[in-house]
Amino acid sequence: MANERTFSILKPDATRRNITGAVNAVIEAAGLRIVGQRRIRMTREQAEKFYEVHKERPFFGELVEFMTSGPVVVQVLEGENAVAKYREVMGATNPAQAADGTIRKQFAESVGENTVHGSDSADNARLEIAQFFNDADIAA
């Protein structure tokens, strides 16, 4: 089992409903450590760059609008197999299909407002972390 880092965003629906502490409790209960965390207002440029992989998808504009509609909490999580573990803890993108006990089953309102983002690979985690954090921001 490898100790690794992953990237997380608590999305505007989570900050708007003031549930970031409850989401963090689920993350920590799963054995992941929050080693970097900042509450920010994502700019349009940041959102477009971050979700560039979805640029040609029909939901891209709506996604950018949503991610810039309010504050988000960007995080670096650390633990054994952090990428896979966090994806399991997040649950399916569609909260109706998410397993009981997952973040999205407990807190997400819809597919579009699904509370959290998590990196899908260790390589993407490194890239995503670097967009929002430098080494001095991470206290392992």
From Swiss-Prot:
Regions crossing the membrane: none
Function per UniProt: Major role in the synthesis of nucleoside triphosphates other than ATP. The ATP gamma phosphate is transferred to the NDP beta phosphate via a ping-pong mechanism, using a phosphorylated active-site intermediate.
Catalysed conversion reaction: a 2'-deoxyribonucleoside 5'-diphosphate + ATP = a 2'-deoxyribonucleoside 5'-triphosphate + ADP; a ribonucleoside 5'-diphosphate + ATP = a ribonucleoside 5'-triphosphate + ADP
CDD domains associated with the record: NDPk_I (cd04413)
Superkingdom classification of source: Bacteria
One Gene Ontology biological process: UTP biosynthetic process
Keywords: ATP-binding, Cytoplasm, Kinase, Magnesium, Metal-binding, Nucleotide metabolism, Nucleotide-binding, Phosphoprotein, Transferase
Similarity section: Belongs to the NDK family.
Residues engaged in binding ATP: K11, F59, R87, T93, R104, N114
UniProt-annotated catalytic positions: H117
EC identifiers of the protein: 2.7.4.6
Primary enzyme class: transferase
GO terms for MF: ATP binding; metal ion binding; nucleoside diphosphate kinase activity
Lineage: Bacteria, Pseudomonadati, Pseudomonadota, Alphaproteobacteria, Hyphomicrobiales
Name of this chain's protein: Nucleoside diphosphate kinase
Cofactor: Mg(2+)
GO cellular component assignments: cytoplasm
Entry's localization field: Cytoplasm
Main location as per UniProt: cytoplasm
Subunit structure: Homotetramer.
PROSITE patterns linked to this entry: NDPK_LIKE (PS51374)
